[in-house]
Amino acid sequence: VTNLSGDLAKVFLKINKKYGTDTIVLGSDITQTGGRITSGSLTLDVALGGGWPTNQWHELIGESTNGKTAIALKTIAANQKRDPEFTTVWVAAEEWVPSYAEMCGVDSARVYVVSTNIMEEAYEAVIEIVESKAIDCIVIDSLPALVPSAEDDKEMEEATVGRGALLTNKFFRKVGKASKRSLVTPERPFIGLIINQWRSKVGVMYGDPRTTPGGLGK
């Protein structure tokens, strides 16, 4: 921040020194407003306003076998064709099927697969990968398949309440910080895709009975 003097300049300089040089900038200096990445579908791109907004997380939600994974794969395939350096990380909490990916046009040799369904492991890996600013796309497939370690260690009859919701909310707070990119300095953008499924709430008489795994924990 330039052209300032007095107490305000001292405060801004102190904050930028403590939290990073781009923490406070002039509005007129902002040039990196975030772009968009094609979904591989013209119709979906139009609905999204030009494609997936970068440096953000997007939830692909629907019933089972409704094409959520296909949308993620088509997004990867379209951008691999556009950019030879396009790099993807796929968190395979369920599975990674090379033959299906290739049928959707994906070059599997340019996709790195994280094979775990333990929630803490997956979330920590994703946060570190996003912080690296070295990838273009990261997909979590899927949220319902992730299991908190506390639940994984228990027997079927033992209850665990709210652990997944708490971890998921903590993850989004931390990955939100990791997803932040400079407003004035060019940095590699990315998109995050999370695949989720509808579930039905028991005993709902009015309103939409649908809900999603993830919960409302804080």
Which role fits each region the language model picked out?
Residues 2-110, 123-131:
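The Walker A/P-loop phosphate-binding site
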Residues 12-13, 145, 151, 200-205:
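N-terminal cationic and glycine-rich segments that engage phosphates or anionic surfaces
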Residues 142:
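Walker B catalytic acidic pair
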Residues 109-120, 151-167, 206-212:
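Flexible beta-alpha connector loops of hexameric P-loop NTPases
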Residues 84-86, 108-109, 135, 188-190, ...:
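Short glycine-/polar-rich loops that comprise or flank the Walker A/P-loop
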